């Protein structure tokens, strides 16, 4: 039977049954054949030199494609397993796969795990295997044959049990692995790889399963790719908020308390407190009423809201109080704010009604997903909900967006994009079941963005279960996209909770609920800022804004303490370093701690009623009158800037008044 193959340009050609991607590619051009590594048939990756199974749309994947790099790294993971099996015959394997920036394989050994010190030996074994350039042979095993092949490996046996029949794999010499993924046709192109690290990972990501050892590596088509990767990893380490948080004593996580439950040290708590006060003041000035609501609620509240049906896997188990009452740690704040709205009969005169809270929430995150402050189990969300009449939606949307842009300006967040997040039309069961609501709300959201003439892109499958949203995607310090802010239209929860207001006509009407987050959770926002600023926070955010150093405690400490008193009275955060250490050591430590201003006082400064000031990152000091320095620092803090000048408010201008 002939194969009808459709190419990306729309042309359809017939090929005999048994044709491979390799044969088709070689028939197109030799230059393409030199770069090709796999195919994609109807969107699924297929091996380069295996027979094409059926007719369909075919793309040739080359070394220039992201999928080509994925195939390279999947092959590297396979060779890693082969090398480990050769070095440690008793080793058991979990799963290995390519990642966005490399590959890994999960392993387990009864006689001691592989350590970081062993990685050079493992890599040499991989390089020796690659040098032999033995053929990678695709194999097909029956379920019985697969059980026999992996009879001594408990984790592979579980994978076989869950797989279909027959089972695909690859063979390299005497090594066979159960492998559904596509690998390179040969090992000759696998020249540039490096093993990187070792970490723990629960089998299949479940904390109830055994902890395996995950060995990480990366691979590229060229040595330059490997060198560039090393530079990126070094840069990532320098920006890593977990490392900076440790060095600047911002936060820590204690395993005796539990993963994903950070402790805020005084320095980190100061940054958080400044941000929280800033946010609250900003929201109150914008018409929000701040509230406090319980972190616990009756489970029925979340059944009514739909969280229990659509979000249960991310919620902690309910607490049975023994008298029929079931309490739940809240995963979101919106049902609580609905209770605030419902506490009184509402009139159209009260709308828009804006409610905000720095609300603590809890999410059932798996241990393997937790990371510093970015992924935690307890978090505090800068949350807000506005209840509006239908004809107020567009103006309120604009008002919220103006507030977000104003906050971004104060934090100097400039690299962001707008994403309209819709439900997945092919997977509607995971969303609230009301097609009319989805059509209307998605249309309103798109209309508001079009009216503002702002560029945006659309993404299906990214909506909340109860409605579409605008996600503002910011670039992290390493160039990755991260959702910072959201605005969501919600027709569902007002319906579920029977929310009403009395209109001008004296009749009851249903409000629209707008969910919005300005900066997300305090935890993730501070992680983001720590990495963007590389720990060198602007003066208004810095835990310690200035450190005062007397040259001689006996002669200059009294003057330094008078300056400190003035600065504290002006609302500044200042410390005195009067330790019995060398001056150079104290100055270097202040720079290491990234304190914005190091202020030195000696005889000359004492006589001139002045101070010598060194800004963080500068190599020189400047003498200033003590009062002038304090006034300039107050102005800098007041205006959220480094130079004390009032900023123009360009972001607000873009969106109008």
Curated annotation (Swiss-Prot):
Manner of cofactor binding, per the entry note: Binds 1 zinc ion per subunit.
Major location (coarse): cytoplasm
Known EC number: 6.1.1.3
Gene3D superfamilies (alphabetical): 3.10.20.30, 3.30.54.20, Anticodon-binding domain, Bira Bifunctional Protein, Domain 2, Threonyl-trna Synthetase, Chain A, domain 2
Molecular function via GO: ATP binding; catalytic activity, acting on a protein; metal ion binding; threonine-tRNA ligase activity; transferase activity; tRNA binding
Protein residues bound to Zn(2+): 334, 385, 515
Pfam families found in the cross-reference section: HGTP_anticodon, TGS, tRNA-synt_2b
The keyword Ligase belongs to this UniProt entry's keyword annotation: yes
Disulphide linkage map: none
Cofactor(s) named in the record: Zn(2+)
Family that this chain belongs to: Belongs to the class-II aminoacyl-tRNA synthetase family.
The protein's role, per its UniProt record: Catalyzes the attachment of threonine to tRNA(Thr) in a two-step reaction: L-threonine is first activated by ATP to form Thr-AMP and then transferred to the acceptor end of tRNA(Thr). Also edits incorrectly charged L-seryl-tRNA(Thr).
Protein name according to UniProt: Threonine--tRNA ligase
This protein's encoding gene: thrS
């Amino acid at each position: 039977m002939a194969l009808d193959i459709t190419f990306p340009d729309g042309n359809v050609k017939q090929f005999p049954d048994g044709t491979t991607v390799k044969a088709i590619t070689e028939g197109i051009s030799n230059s393409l054949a030199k770069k090709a590594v796999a195919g994609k048939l109807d969107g699924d990756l297929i091996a380069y030199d295996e027979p094409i199974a059926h007719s369909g749309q075919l793309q040739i994947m080359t070394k220039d494609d992201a999928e080509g790099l994925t195939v390279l790294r999947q092959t590297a993971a396979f060779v890693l397993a082969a090398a480990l099996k050769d070095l440690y015959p008793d080793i058991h394997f979990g799963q290995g796969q390519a990642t966005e920036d490399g590959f890994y394989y999960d392993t387990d050994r009864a006689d001691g795990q592989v350590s970081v010190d062993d990685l050079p030996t493992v890599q040499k074994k991989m390089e020796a295997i690659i040098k032999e350039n033995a053929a990678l042979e695709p194999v097909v095993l029956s379920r019985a044959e697969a059980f026999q092949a992996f009879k001594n490996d408990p984790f592979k046996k579980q994978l076989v049990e869950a797989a279909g029949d027959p089972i695909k794999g690859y063979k390299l010499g005497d090594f066979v692995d159960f492998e559904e993924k596509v690998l390179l046709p040969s090992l000759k192109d696998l020249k540039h790889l490096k093993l990187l690290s070792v970490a723990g990972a629960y089998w299949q990501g479940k904390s109830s399963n055994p902890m395996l050892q995950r060995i990480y590596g990366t691979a590229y088509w060229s040595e330059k790719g490997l060198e560039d990767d090393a530079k990126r990893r070094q840069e990532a380490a320098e920006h890593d908020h977990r490392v900076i948080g440790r060095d600047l004593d911002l936060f820590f996580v204690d395993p005796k308390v539990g993963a994903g439950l950070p402790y805020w040290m005084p320095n980190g708590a100061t940054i958080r407190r400044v941000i929280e006060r800033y946010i609250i003041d900003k929201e109150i000035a914008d018409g929000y009423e701040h509230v406090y609501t319980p972190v616990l609620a009756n489970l029925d509240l979340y059944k009514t809201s739909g969280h229990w049906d659509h979000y249960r896997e991310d919620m902690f188990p309910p607490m049975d109080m023994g008298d029929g009452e079931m309490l739940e740690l809240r995963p979101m704040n919106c049902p609580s704010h609905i209770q605030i709205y419902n506490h009184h009969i509402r009139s159209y005169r009260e709308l828009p009604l804006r409610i905000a809270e720095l609300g603590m929430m809890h999410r059932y995150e798996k241990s393997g997903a937790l990371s510093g402050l970015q992924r935690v189990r307890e978090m505090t969300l800068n949350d807000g909900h506005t209840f509006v009449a239908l004809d107020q939606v567009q103006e309120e949307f604009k008002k919220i967006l103006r507030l977000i842009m104003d906050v971004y300006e104060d934090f100097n967040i400039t690299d962001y994009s707008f994403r309209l997040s819709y439900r997945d039309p092919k997977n509607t069961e995971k969303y609230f079941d009301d097609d009319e609501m989805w059509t209307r709300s998605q249309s309103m959201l798109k209309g508001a963005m079009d009216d503002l003439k702002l560029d945006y892109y659309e993404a299906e499958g990214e909506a909340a279960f109860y409605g579409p949203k605008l996600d503002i995607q910011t670039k992290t310090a390493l160039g990755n996209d991260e959702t910072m802010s959201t605005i969501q239209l919600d027709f569902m929860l007002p319906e579920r909770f029977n929310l009403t207001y009395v209109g001008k006509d004296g009749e009851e009407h249903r409000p629209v609920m707008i969910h919005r987050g300005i900066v997300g959770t305090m935890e993730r926002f501070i992680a983001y800022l720590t990495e963007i600023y590389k720990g060198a926070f602007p003066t208004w955010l810095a835990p310690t804004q200035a450190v005062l150093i007397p040259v001689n405690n006996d002669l200059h400490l009294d003057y330094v303490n008078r300056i400190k008193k003035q600065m504290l009275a002006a609302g500044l955060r200042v410390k005195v370093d009067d330790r019995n250490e060398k001056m150079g050591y104290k100055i270097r430590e202040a720079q290491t701690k990234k304190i914005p201003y190091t202020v030195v006082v000696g005889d000359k400064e004492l006589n001139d009623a002045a101070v010598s000031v060194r800004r963080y990152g500068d190599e020189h000091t400047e003498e200033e009158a003590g009062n002038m320095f304090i006034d300039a620092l107050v102005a800098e803090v007041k205006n959220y800037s480094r130079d004390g000048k009032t900023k123009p408010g360009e972001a607000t201008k873009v969106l109008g008044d």
